[in-house]
Amino acid sequence: NGFKRFLHNDLLALERAFCQNTGPHVVATEGVFSMDGDSPPMAELVALCQQNQAPLLLDDAHGLGVVGHEGAGTMSSQGLENAQLQCLMANFGKALGAQGGFLAADAVTIDYLRQTSRHYIYSTALSPGYCEGIRLAIKACRAQQWRRDKLQDNIGSFRNMAQQAGIS
């Protein structure tokens, strides 16, 4: 049946989409939406996906390093475990200031992607030295809560100024 969209963070619309479309379903969403900085209600979304046997894929490019305990991302920020997802993916280019990214999933999913993803098959892996740089960026990110606190302060200040200027 192809891909179907549902309204932004509207779980009732997603539930209707499940009912109106037969066949297997897969749900993909962002953890933190870049335009507004809002997040889906992940506990409810996970439950709805489980109820409809729909794997949930979370792109946490804007959540990793920014929200959650030690910058662990959207699921952590909402008190949930990443294990409730079929796939968790993010890039290293936002909070970590690097290139590349990752996709975390169960062994069956990873094996399938290894065998069928042209971008994976025909690409060069990140070098060990580069991976060490990413590891150190993650270590620094986890240890520096003050940076996440300052970011949230800056976001709040910007929103207040935008509202006062009649922009929001």
Briefly describe each language-model feature range.
Residues H8-N9, T29-V32, D60-A61, Q78, ...:
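Fold-independent oxyanion-binding glycine-rich loops
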Residues P40, P128, E132-S168:
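Conserved PLP-dependent catalytic core of the aminotransferase class-I/II
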Residues Q53, G73-F92, D111, Q115:
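Conserved active-site segment immediately N-terminal to the catalytic lysine
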